[in-house]
């Protein structure tokens, strides 16, 4: 069976670049256009672009400079920082690339030997695999599910400290994908303390943080001082993936380096992206309300079906997705490709995120309630088929 989880080594890809394997699984199944879809990791919201831009939509292809409110100013105001602390990028995944290049630029002239990056698991594959391209070595550090069955996924301090003592940079995801759980406040503060102690730069992919703004534990990493880089975008929480709009926030010296790197690779942002984002950023509260509405309407239906099948459900405190473990160590790829496909349903196997999650399934409640109800009915039938 093909392995789809993220890679932390270049084994079998010396003098080359490993693929993002999960896309080889996911894209063909998206193209099947199954009737029911619980696979989305981001909010599904239909923005009225024409209504939002009005007559200015005719200018969408014209240069935007001096013609729109600077999105950096809007983001800076929202995050309580200066515009000089913000860099706009083409989405969060480019933000990962730029952030890591920036961190390496800050240290490479003083590092003797290899540049080493620690990266957490489970994770979004481009995080460790960007490090495989740009750094010399990647050390995997793990988050594990709660032993009680409910609560935060936690880190092992001994394992993480050993890795951080060897590393120059650590890459984390405060809202874990696929669990949906926010980084425990004790673990977060411990990571910050060890980063300071060992002079480690912290890069945080915070693409899901905005769905947890009401939770104190979701405090952005950039707020802890210099050498902390936050990555965010309008993709996952705000359903603007097609325009590829993201940003970095850090201290002004770090952002100045990041800006030079961005301009070297990309020049400037596209006009359609900047024009749409400048307007969408003023209306994010509309989507915030929809997220809470979807949670209220959709989660009780999901809880009931999982309880019916005797499946433990570790529901996250916020956001739009979570994961559960199938009974009897059932392989989740088999579940997705046989039982779910039979009922025209798409879910995401946990093996897309870690080799330790081969019996886990990620589901999202980020779709309109009537669609979600039908999808969960298909999930119910799929579980019946798989477990009975």
Question: Where is each model-derived feature located?
Answer:
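A short helix->loop->beta-strand "cap" motif at the edges of active sites that frequently abuts
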Residues: 115, 136, 197-200, 226
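Active-site phosphate-binding strand-loop segment of PLP-dependent enzymes
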Residues: 143-214
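Conserved PLP-anchoring active-site segment centered on the Schiff-base-forming lysine
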Residues: 102-131, 158-161
